[in-house]
Each structure stands twice: as C-alpha cells, then as structure tokens.
Amino acid sequence: KYTGNMAESPRWEVCLDSSASVFWKGMGRRYVDKTFSQAAKLYMEGMIENLKSEFQKMIEENTWMSQDTKKEAYLKLAAINKKIGYPDTDFTEDDIDKFYENYTMSEDHYYNNRVLNNKLSNLESILSLRKPVDKKEWSMAPYEVNAYYSRSVNEIAFPAGILQSPFFSQTFQDSMNYGAIGVVIGHEITHGFDDQGSQYDAKGNLRNWWQATDRENFVKRTQCIVNQNANFRVDEINMTLNGINTQGESVADNGGVKESF
C-alpha cells in the first residue's frame, strides 16, 4: 500500500550516512584501492570512446537534421569530458590528510562533531566563492552506485561504485559489459542532446545552437516517447505518468540502448 510516509532508517544506516557525508574522500580512497584498478579505468575509457563513435554515426545518418546543427553536435560530442572511477587530482593519501587536518572528531561527542563539520563545510563554501570553478571536481563520491551528465560543464562521470558487477567487470565478455554499463554510458552521453541538454553548447553555455527547423523536427520525433509514457498507468494509485516530465530520461534510455547495441 502506498502511503507516502517514509519509515525511519535503522541507526546503523543513519551513522553510516552521517560519516560518509563528512569523510567521503577518505572512504572513497579506501574503496577505490580495494575495488577499482587502473586497468579497469583504461578499459572504461575505451568503452566510452567506442560509444561516442556510435553516437557520431547516429548523427551522421540522421536525415532530419541540417549540416549546420550537425556540425555543432559533433563539436559538443567531441568536447564531452569523461570522469572515471575517482578524481585524478587531490586524491593521494597526503591530499586527503591535508583535507581533513582540521576535523578533530571525538567518538564521545556526536553533536559537537556535527557542529564542527557544519562550520568547516560552510567555511569551505564561502571561500569557494572567490575561487575559479574547478572543473576537475566531482559531484559524487567514488563509492556511489550512480552516474551523471552535467550540462553546465559538458561532462559524464562514472564513480567506481557503479563500475562493479553486475554492471561491469574486466572478467565479463564484451557483450556483457556493453549490455550493462555500456547502456549507462550511452544514456549519459545522450543526456547531452535530450530536451534539456540540447539547450547547452560544447562549453556548457546556455546557447541555442539548433536551426529552428531542426528543433521542430526534434520535438516532433520525441512526441512518440511522450505519448508512450503518458499511456503508462499505475492502477494502485489511479495515476498515469507525466510523459513530458519523463521524456529526458526516456530519450536517454532509448539512445543508450541503441548506441550500446
């Protein structure tokens, strides 16, 4: 039965989430050392380049998009930055020790620990206002089982947490990897060209790089996905999906499968 009420999490989960919110960098280093090799990172780099090549072929074979818009699409595709496994900078043991040098925690004073953490986190946020944007910074911890595409910097990221079985393994056959993490990679690449991502250019600037007719054609072709989702009904709550709100994820899902296949 759907009630909308969230059950209280068990104490161990609360403690784990609380610790991870502060010590994500140290925990991430330990997780990577145990589960993710340099060879796996190189393998993933090859997969991403292969899927980008497939997406380029899809653009080339496209019959409804003008050459001017295709040219911009090629530039954006080529400029997509990839982040794999873990940060490439500020992730050594010395870097992490320096990062936490002011975090003097006590196992007997949880409240004081939280106050100190909030103080240091707020200070870090304030100081960052006077610093240039660090495009090497990650939006996820290395152990998270997730992936993302960022429109504002035109990048895709795959933490080490998702680069594990059953999504990915160097011991898998290529067909298994492309059928699992390959679809996820293609999904994130496609996000750069969905209803929202397509509004940003190769540098992550909000700019219309589409010819008007091409944009109209794109909207017409995504309508079938909108309609398909709008016809999906959940009888238990007497509601249907909002086809417009879900189109970005559905376009990315379809694109990911096509690229990976």
Predicted regions and their residues:
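Intrinsically disordered, low-complexity linker/terminal regions across diverse proteins
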Residues: 9, 13-16, 20-261
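Catalytic nucleotidyl-transfer cores of nucleotide-processing enzymes
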Residues: 1-6, 11
